């Protein structure tokens, strides 16, 4: 009988580890005061942004991140009742979903976030949330690259044209200079 709870805890740690490995960012929130229906509502909103909200005991989360440096940023936020929002997909969309939920219910408290081994504050997470979606950023980068390529092509195309104009201008300039010298000597 004593091994059964340990086996469940080990299974839970493994599940959390696999979710963390698939995640890009983790938000840590205090969920005190949320009803079951509100928690289910939050989970449903987060699912749309490819994020998962889990309530995990802090000791189990410590075990799950113990050997993963990428998630060491979570450790400072592990105190009291804690829920973890593991974002696998669109980070700005998931952060916005959480922020909208928090504004609506006024019952959750954002403790912090972690990504790439760093701890993030609310302001840092909000700055990320205000970024355009991934597809828009990719389109902007592609547009910038296309613009650079176009400018380069136009510039390279202009060089031979300008060289040709310069070559054509040499005889005309030489003729004007000779005419000016002749006019000066005649005067």
UniProtKB/Swiss-Prot annotation:
UniProt-listed Pfam families: Ribosomal_L10
Cross-referenced PROSITE patterns: RIBOSOMAL_L10
InterPro entries to which the protein is assigned, alphabetical: Ribosomal_uL10, Ribosomal_uL10-like_sf, Ribosomal_uL10_bac, Ribosomal_uL10_bac_type, Ribosomal_uL10_CS_bac
Tagged with keyword Oxidoreductase: no
Transmembrane segment boundaries: none
CC per GO annotation: large ribosomal subunit
Keywords tagged on the record: Ribonucleoprotein, Ribosomal protein, RNA-binding, rRNA-binding
GO molecular function: large ribosomal subunit rRNA binding; structural constituent of ribosome
A biological-process GO annotation: translation
Keyword Ribosomal protein: yes
Known partners and oligomeric status: Part of the ribosomal stalk of the 50S ribosomal subunit. The N-terminus interacts with L11 and the large rRNA to form the base of the stalk. The C-terminus forms an elongated spine to which L12 dimers bind in a sequential fashion forming a multimeric L10(L12)X complex.
Protein family (similarity comment): Belongs to the universal ribosomal protein uL10 family.
Function according to Swiss-Prot or TrEMBL: Forms part of the ribosomal stalk, playing a central role in the interaction of the ribosome with GTP-bound translation factors.
Name of the protein this chain belongs to: Large ribosomal subunit protein uL10
Lineage summary: Bacteria, Bacillati, Cyanobacteriota, Cyanophyceae, Synechococcales
């Amino acid at each position: 009988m004593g091994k059964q709870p340990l086996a469940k805890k080990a299974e839970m740690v493994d599940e959390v580890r696999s979710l963390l490995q698939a995640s890009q960012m983790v938000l840590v929130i205090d969920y005190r005061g949320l009803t079951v229906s509100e928690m289910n509502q939050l989970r449903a909103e987060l699912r749309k942004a490819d994020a998962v909200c889990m309530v995990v005991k802090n000791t189990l989360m410590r075990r799950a991140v113990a050997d993963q440096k990428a998630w060491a940023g979570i450790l400072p936020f592990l105190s009291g009742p804690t829920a973890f929002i593991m974002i696998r997909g669109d980070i700005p969309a998931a952060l916005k979903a959480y922020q909208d939920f928090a504004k609506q219910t006024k019952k959750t408290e954002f403790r912090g976030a972690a990504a790439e081994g760093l701890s993030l504050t609310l302001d840092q997470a909000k700055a990320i949330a205000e970024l355009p979606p991934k597809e828009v950023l990719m389109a902007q980068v592609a547009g910038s690259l296309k613009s650079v390529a176009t400018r380069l092509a136009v510039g390279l195309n202009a060089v031979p044209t300008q060289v040709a104009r310069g070559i054509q201008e040499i005889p005309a300039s030489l003729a004007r200079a000779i005419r000016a010298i002749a006019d000066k000597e005649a005067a």
